[in-house]
């Protein structure tokens, strides 16, 4: 008689719970529950589950796109650890970041905000391309990323996670919730700690390959339900210290008496609330009041340049929704957003301000903008086969005046195997140039910032999706094309003057064409393969010349494989990526007669892999990142003289670290997410 072990029974039960049947054109398809699904409705995007995120280490939001063909995350420079997300070939300033469907990580939080969301706090993530709904504001130009945290109302229990890497990074995460009064009153605490103590200098340039980061992050969330009223709310606080610069041996290698150091200290406080009043459940009629506030304090020292910023943000939205009939939905609302930045930029006594740009001395650099607005959105939904969504916003900025935001989305599914989506719309944003790009302070160039206009762009997109029965499974094919055309834009000009970094207004054309195809198929109900290819054509006018955007790869090819054994005890994941080459900023000739850098960079490949072993109440995972060990050669230009004006750590297009291994454990006591 064969008796299945308890752990195997549990894993088999969990695996069976993820099985799902689909009936498609008289063909019955049995498959494991998808970890990445298309968004419902007219928007083009993906709903990414926790299982998909955990196919890699996923230490934070910035590391959660490893298996995603649409989104790139790159270092902004080689010293601070700042990262930016890219969607449709454009930087993260044009991607609206949301947490729990509330705008977040604006201004000074933008360069490091991807590290403020621990991976183990995330329950799911929604990534949409192109313009999003007008409900969330006017800012999403190229897409929207929304993070859903684990919930107080989830199954009661405690989750723990420990992680360590060969690069000297350690992380600990915990989240626990209790139901005080059934599921009508619940609370949850999430905690995170990380410490990277390594001083590794793998390329011998005298600088640490990665900043030392110590972060404490704590969040408390509540849910209360009574009758037709639902309340969600919470508070969070974060404290982070990051340091980088020359290692001890650098002075003996290159001379000098004072090591170049970067120190960035951050404190961040957030609060949010959601009040929902259900007026008529049968017709989906409800009123909701949503809001969040944040205080972001950052003190930074880049060599001898001091930059301090105190940023406050408040956002509120009053929303009314109703279904006139099952096919007709109306959403209307009011919104309010306020940004306040108090910035201080200074040099030590004796320094000549003009040697460092046009910003010194900036003793009281205040940027303040208040923007109330209103929107209306109509959606027609015919049995999910035809969905048309049209919305219009009107907003008034005390800085830029009144502006309109029209957006339209259409989904047409003429057959179960075929879906067409199209979209068109406009987006705006206010550039806080120094706060959003404060990593540029690490450069030795003079930093010049002009009086910037409000950014504005039109975005148009279309997509085709096929779900084709092949054998016992479905072959999923997708193709999409997006065009973004800027009417006004704040650009960072690396090209015109090799002694300057110039943030200025667009004077000419700027656009992005992005084309992507991807396919996925589940073999033997255990092995899931995905292949994707994306091509970007991004051009901007710099100094009167229409040039390809620098430090931007022209294409990306990705293949992912995920295999789970029949009993669900083992899982093997691998991701291979080929990143296309691109243009570097215009090089200059050094005093020795050499070029500062090559005019172009070549394509490079990366490989990530992870093995997970599941037990009844915990799992252990072991993996490696950048197993091809590709590193950008000399990511810091002028590393032998960091106090000179030729010191340039922002010429980064690829990895600055080599291969890395890691190990982690996830423990679930009572919870099943």
PLM regions and their residue ranges:
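Short acidic/polar hinge/loop motifs at secondary-structure boundaries
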Residues: 84, 102-129, 218
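A beta-strand signature from Gram-negative outer-membrane beta-barrel systems
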Residues: 116-157, 671
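Flexible loop and strand-edge segments within Gram-negative outer membrane beta-barrel domains
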Residues: 196-216, 225-287, 293-311
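Gram-negative outer-membrane beta-barrel transporters
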Residues: 381-384, 477, 481-485, 505-588, ...
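C-terminal beta-signal and adjacent terminal beta-strands/loops
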Residues: 529, 578-588, 612-673
């Amino acid at each position: 008689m064969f008796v299945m072990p308890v752990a195997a029974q549990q894993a088999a039960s969990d695996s069976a719970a993820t099985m799902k049947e689909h009936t498609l054109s008289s063909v019955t398809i049995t498959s494991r529950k998808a970890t990445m699904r298309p968004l419902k409705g007219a928007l083009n995007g993906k709903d990414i589950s926790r299982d998909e995120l955990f196919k890699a280490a996923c230490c934070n939001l910035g590391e959660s796109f490893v298996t995603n063909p649409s989104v790139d995350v790159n270092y902004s420079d080689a010293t601070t650890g700042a990262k930016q997300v890219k969607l449709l070939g454009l930087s993260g300033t044009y991607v609206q970041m949301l947490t729990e469907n509330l705008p977040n990580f604006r201004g000074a939080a933008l360069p490091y905000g991807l590290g403020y969301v621990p991976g183990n706090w995330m329950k799911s993530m929604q990534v949409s391309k192109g313009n999003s709904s007008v409900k969330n504001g006017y800012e999403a130009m190229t897409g929207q990323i929304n993070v859903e945290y684990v919930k107080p109302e989830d199954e009661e229990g405690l989750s723990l996670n420990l992680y360590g890497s060969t690069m000297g990074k350690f992380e600990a995460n915990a989240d626990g919730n209790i139901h005080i009064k059934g599921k009508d009153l619940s609370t949850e605490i999430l905690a995170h700690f990380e410490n990277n103590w390594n001083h590794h200098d793998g390329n011998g340039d005298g600088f640490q390959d990665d900043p030392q980061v110590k972060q404490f992050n704590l969040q408390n969330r509540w849910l209360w339900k009574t009758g037709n009223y639902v309340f969600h709310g919470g508070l969070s606080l974060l404290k982070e210290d990051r340091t980088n610069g020359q290692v001890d041996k650098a002075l003996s290698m290159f001379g000098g008496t004072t090591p170049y150091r970067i120190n960035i200290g951050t404190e961040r406080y957030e609060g949010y609330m959601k009040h929902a009043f259900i007026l008529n459940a049968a017709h989906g009629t409800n009123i909701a009041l949503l809001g969040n506030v944040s205080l972001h304090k950052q003190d930074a020292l880049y060599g001898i340049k001091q930059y301090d910023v105190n940023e406050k943000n408040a956002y509120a939205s009053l929303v009314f929704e109703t279904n006139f009939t099952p096919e007709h939905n109306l959403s209307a609302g009011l919104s309010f957003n306020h940004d306040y930045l108090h910035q201080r930029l200074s040099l030590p006594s004796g320094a000549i301000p003009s040697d460092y740009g046009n910003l010194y001395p900036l003793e009281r650099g205040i940027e303040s903008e208040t923007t109330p607005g209103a929107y209306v959105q109509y959606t027609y939904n015919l049995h999910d086969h035809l969905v048309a969504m049209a919305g219009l916003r009107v907003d008034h900025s005390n800085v830029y005046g009144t502006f309109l935001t029209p957006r339209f989305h259409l989904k047409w599914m003429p057959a179960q195997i075929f879906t067409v989506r199209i979209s068109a719309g406009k987006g705006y944003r206010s550039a806080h140039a120094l706060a959003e790009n404060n990593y540029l302070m690490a450069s030795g160039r003079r930093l010049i910032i002009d009086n910037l206009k409000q950014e504005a762009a039109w975005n148009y997109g279309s997509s085709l999706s096929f779900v084709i029965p092949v054998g016992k499974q479905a072959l999923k094919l997708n193709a999409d094309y997006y065009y973004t055309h800027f009417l006004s834009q704040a650009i960072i000009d690396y090209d015109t003057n090799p002694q300057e970094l110039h943030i200025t207004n667009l004077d000419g054309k700027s656009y992005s064409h992005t084309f992507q195809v991807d396919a996925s198929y589940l073999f033997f109900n255990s092995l899931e393969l995905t292949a994707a290819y994306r091509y970007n054509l991004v051009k901007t006018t710099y100094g009167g010349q229409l040039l390809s955007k620098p430090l931007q790869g022209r294409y990306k090819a990705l293949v992912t494989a995920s295999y789970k054994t029949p009993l669900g005890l083992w899982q093997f994941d691998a991701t291979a990526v080929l990143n296309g080459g691109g243009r570097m900023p215009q090089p200059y000739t050094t005093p020795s007669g050499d070029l500062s850098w090559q005019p172009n960079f070549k394509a490079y490949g990366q490989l990530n892999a992870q093995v997970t072993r599941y037990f009844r109440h915990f799992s252990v995972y072991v993996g490696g990142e950048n197993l091809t060990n590709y590193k950008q050669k000399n990511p810091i230009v002028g590393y032998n003289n960091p106090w000179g004006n030729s010191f340039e750590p922002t010429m980064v297009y690829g990895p600055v670290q080599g291969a890395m291994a890691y190990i982690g454990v996830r423990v679930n006591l009572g919870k099943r997410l």
